[in-house]
Curated annotation (Swiss-Prot):
Keywords: ATP-binding, Ligase, Nucleotide-binding, Protein biosynthesis. Its EC number is 6.3.5.-. Belongs to the GatB/GatE family. GatB subfamily. SMART domains: GatB_Yqey. Allows the formation of correctly charged Asn-tRNA(Asn) or Gln-tRNA(Gln) through the transamidation of misacylated Asp-tRNA(Asn) or Glu-tRNA(Gln) in organisms which lack either or both of asparaginyl-tRNA or glutaminyl-tRNA synthetases. The reaction takes place in the presence of glutamine and ATP through an activated phospho-Asp-tRNA(Asn) or phospho-Glu-tRNA(Gln). InterPro entries: Asn/Gln-tRNA_amidoTrfase_suB/E, Asn/Gln-tRNA_Trfase_suB/E_cat, Asn/Gln_amidotransferase, Asn/Gln_tRNA_amidoTrase-B-like, GatB, GatB_C_1, GatB_Yqey_C_2, Gln-tRNA_amidoTrfase_suB_CS. It catalyses: L-glutamyl-tRNA(Gln) + L-glutamine + ATP + H2O = L-glutaminyl-tRNA(Gln) + L-glutamate + ADP + phosphate + H(+); L-aspartyl-tRNA(Asn) + L-glutamine + ATP + H2O = L-asparaginyl-tRNA(Asn) + L-glutamate + ADP + phosphate + 2 H(+). This is Aspartyl/glutamyl-tRNA(Asn/Gln) amidotransferase subunit B. GO terms for biological process: glutaminyl-tRNAGln biosynthesis via transamidation; translation. Heterotrimer of A, B and C subunits.
Length: 481
């Protein structure tokens, strides 16, 4: 819980979130126009219905309904058997019809939750999930405004939480977890930079211990988790300062200026009656039966939380490794392919350490890696069957990234095969001990740390190719004689 110290009293922050998630589908919610709008030329992905041409009627995209139900199930929601579409009436240049089709009275899903494991398993209640149209995009340039309708009519899921957050850290965990789930079930790509996931934050403050909520302000269209946190923190402090100075906090809609780090009013906040909601006469209500809900439920993949639990149970992974490997779908697929052929801990160690280290340096994702899961399996094969040592394997791994060649070919071309000939290693060990006779005496007098020095000298002579287990055994044997 975030407490803001004041002169009159201490203040508690109360936060609710409305997340707008763009539905992954090929066509828009009520038209056949393409949703591939991000890099498209302005006004090229537009159907007549999207720009409200007279006589054009909406045709519901069933797949968007399917995606919304899938999301509701993944977020532990109740899927409503009856839901319907309404018109939200307001004027704005990028909304050509003068109304947005949404679900005000009968949303598709209600009563869900997300559990915040890093905050004592706190449950954040999800009030509702409803489908609605996105608006177009206004582009302001000097003294003119241009409208791009490519985005108009794209399906959004609005995921509305209850005002259960009491800190920006809780907000951040919720958004990360929500985005992770949406990506896993492939209902939204979660790309905040491209606007696929946008967040509105409702912020108010109240005296600590008070049961009465304060007047809230809504901060619109936040497109990164960092900006969400900054905007909420600024707005909460602004409200506290106003109340401490005897001012009245009014209900406003705000924008967050990322340059100044401040919020600014764009309009006085409207209430629901200002939008004159009424049922859309051009769309039938949705009646969803148990059979359809079960069909959607059966299509859900294993969720990240379930994967993490399985990784800790089946592979004995640490919570840290299980968290990392289960938090991204592509990473989880990669890990499971490798763990199917090799020890899970060994696979996790190489992926979270060696692989991620190189990916981070290159600034690429696991899907862009030149080393596939099959390549890593082959490399681990060479370690397990003692063809190469772990140290040499790291060198081979680097060469795999650079050349794209198989590990076996690299080992062959560079002569990196591990030396496991006992007689040859015995000769090298004998030579190392003879050349370090004084240190051998020190070792036998109790300076046992020198054992590692002897191992290092042998590895140096063999350019790291000696079998380390055999080297340890032979050195121990010769020192005891």
């Amino acid at each position: 819980m975030t407490i803001i110290k004041g002169n009159r009293c201490d203040w508690e922050v109360v936060i609710g979130l409305e997340v707008h998630a763009q539905v992954i589908s090929n066509s828009k919610l009520f038209s056949g126009a393409s949703t591939k709008t991000y890099d498209a030329l302005p006004n090229t992905q537009v159907a007549l219905f999207d720009v409200a041409m007279p006589g054009m009627l909406p045709v519901l995209n069933e797949y968007c309904v399917y995606q919304a139900i899938k999301t509701g199930i993944a977020l532990s929601c109740k899927i409503n058997k009856y839901s319907a579409f309404d018109r939200k009436n307001y004027f704005y240049p990028d909304l050509p019809s003068g109304y947005q089709i949404t679900q005000f009275y009968y949303p598709i899903a209600t009563e869900g939750k997300i559990v915040l494991e890093d905050h004592d398993m706190k449950e954040i209640r999800i009030a509702r999930i409803h489908l609605e149209q996105d608006a177009g995009k206004s582009i302001h340039e000097f003294d003119k405004t241009y409208i791009d309708f490519n985005r108009a009519g794209v399906a959004l899921m609005e995921i509305v939480s209850e005002p259960d957050f009491r800190s920006i850290e809780e907000v951040a965990e919720y958004l990360k977890k929500l985005r992770m789930i949406l990506r896993f079930i492939e209902t939204c790509d979660g790309d905040m930079e491209k606007g696929s996931l946008r967040c509105d934050a409702n912020v108010s403050v109240k005296p600590v211990g008070s049961s009465e909520l304060g007047i809230r302000s809504e901060i619109k269209n936040l497109n990164s988790i960092r900006y969400v946190m900054q905007a909420i923190e600024y707005e909460a402090n602004r409200q506290v300062n106003a109340l401490e100075n005897g001012e009245i906090v009014t209900q406003n809609t705000l924008l967050f200026d990322v340059t100044s780090g401040q919020t600014r009013v764009i309009r006085t906040k409207e209430d629901a009656h200002d939008y004159r909601y009424f049922p859309d006469p051009d769309l039938f209500p949705l009646k969803i039966d148990d059979q359809y809900i079960d069909h959607v439920r059966s299509s859900l993949p294993e969720l990240p939380m379930q994967k993490r639990e399985r990784y800790t149970n089946d592979f004995s992974l640490s919570k840290y490794d299980a968290d990392i490997l289960s938090s991204d779908k592509d990473v989880a697929i990669y890990f499971e392919k490798v763990a199917e052929k090799h020890d899970g801990k060994l696979a996790a160690s190489w992926i979270t350490g060696e692989l991620f280290g190189r990916l981070n340096r290159l600034g690429i994702t696991i899907g862009e890696s030149s080393v596939t899961a099959e390549d890593l399996i082959q490399l681990l094969d060479l370690i397990v069957n003692n063809t190469i040592s772990g140290k040499i394997a790291k060198q081979v791994f680097d060469m795999m990234f650079e050349s794209g060649k198989s590990p076996a070919l690299i080992v062959s071309e560079h002569g990196l095969k591990q030396v496991s000939d006992e007689n040859a290693l015995s000769v090298i060990v004998e030579r190392v001990l003879k050349n370090n006779a004084s240190k051998v005496v020190e070792y036998k007098q109790g300076k046992e740390k020198l054992f590692g020095y002897f191992v290092g000298q042998v590895m140096k002579e063999t350019q790291g190719k000696a079998n380390p287990d055999m080297v340890n055994s032979i050195i121990k044997q010769q020192l005891e004689n």
